[in-house]
Structures are given as C-alpha cells and as structure tokens.
C-alpha cells in the first residue's frame, strides 16, 4: 500500500480526550506519524493504514470523526546542494638541477704497480 496523509476533524475538549485519541490511533497497524492540532481540532495521520479503520477506531472511543482529506503526504522540499569551492591543485615547478662531473686523469709515469 502507498503512504497516505489523512486529515480528520475530531472534537478535542481536554488533555484526556487528546491522550485517548492519540492512543487509539497509534494502536492501528501502518501508522507512521500522528499529530493533533488542538486549536483547529484536526487530527493528521500519515501511514499506510485505511482511512475507514482510523474513523472506526475513533468511533470506538465515542468521538465523531469527519474525514476532511485523504491524499499523498507532502514531500519535503529538496535542499539545494551547497556549492563547493573548486579545489586547486598547486603546480609544482620543475627546477633543473645542475650536474657537475669532475674527471681526473693522472698524468704520470703510467706505472700502476707500486
């Protein structure tokens, strides 16, 4: 099943009602996220569960649910990749080395036996 976002209008009078609603909905299989807006009296459920099952679960605790919308959840905006500064490889300069060779020739008697 696909993930759905379900918005349900439910009367939320007190903290006890809020707690009972949260407990009842989170017991369902396939529920990923549950949020309650107490000022607007809206329950938002995200998951793979059936909206009818959510409404029935709320009826079991004597609430009168009104389904506002059922649809796919909003996908988060993709964050733009931060631009990376280009990495410059330093150029290694070639420094020629001077090579000095010294050849010494002995001039002399030519006798190698000492």
Swiss-Prot record:
For the lipid attachment S-farnesyl cysteine, which residues are annotated? Answer: 111
Q: Signal sequence span per UniProt?
A: none
Q: Does the keyword Transferase apply?
A: no
Q: Which residues form the HMA domain?
A: 3-69
Q: Does the keyword Transferase apply?
A: no
Give GO MF terms, alphabetically.
metal ion binding
Q: Which InterPro entries match?
A: HIPP, HMA_dom, HMA_dom_sf
Propeptide ranges, please? 112-114
Q: Which residues carry this modification: Cysteine methyl ester?
A: 111
Q: Which key words are in the record?
A: Lipoprotein, Metal-binding, Methylation, Prenylation
Residues annotated for a metal cation binding in this entry: 14, 17
Q: Which cysteines are joined by disulfide bonds?
A: none
Into which family does the record put it? Belongs to the HIPP family.
What is this protein's function? Heavy-metal-binding protein.
UniProt-recorded name of the protein: Heavy metal-associated isoprenylated plant protein 2
Q: To which species is this protein native?
A: Arabidopsis thaliana
* Gene that this sequence comes from: HIPP02
């Amino acid at each position: 099943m696909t993930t759905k976002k379900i918005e349900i209008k439910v009367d939320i009078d007190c903290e006890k009602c809020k707690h009972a609603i949260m407990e009842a909905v989170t017991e369902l299989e396939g529920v990923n996220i549950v949020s309650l807006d107490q000022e607007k009296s809206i329950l938002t459920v995200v998951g793979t569960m059936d909206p009818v099952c959510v409404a029935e679960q709320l009826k079991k605790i004597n609430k009168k649910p009104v389904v506002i919308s059922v649809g796919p959840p909003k996908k988060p905006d993709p964050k733009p990749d931060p631009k990376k500064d280009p990495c410059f490889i330093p150029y290694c300069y070639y420094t020629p080395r001077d090579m000095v060779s010294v050849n010494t020739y002995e001039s002399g008697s030519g006798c190698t036996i000492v």
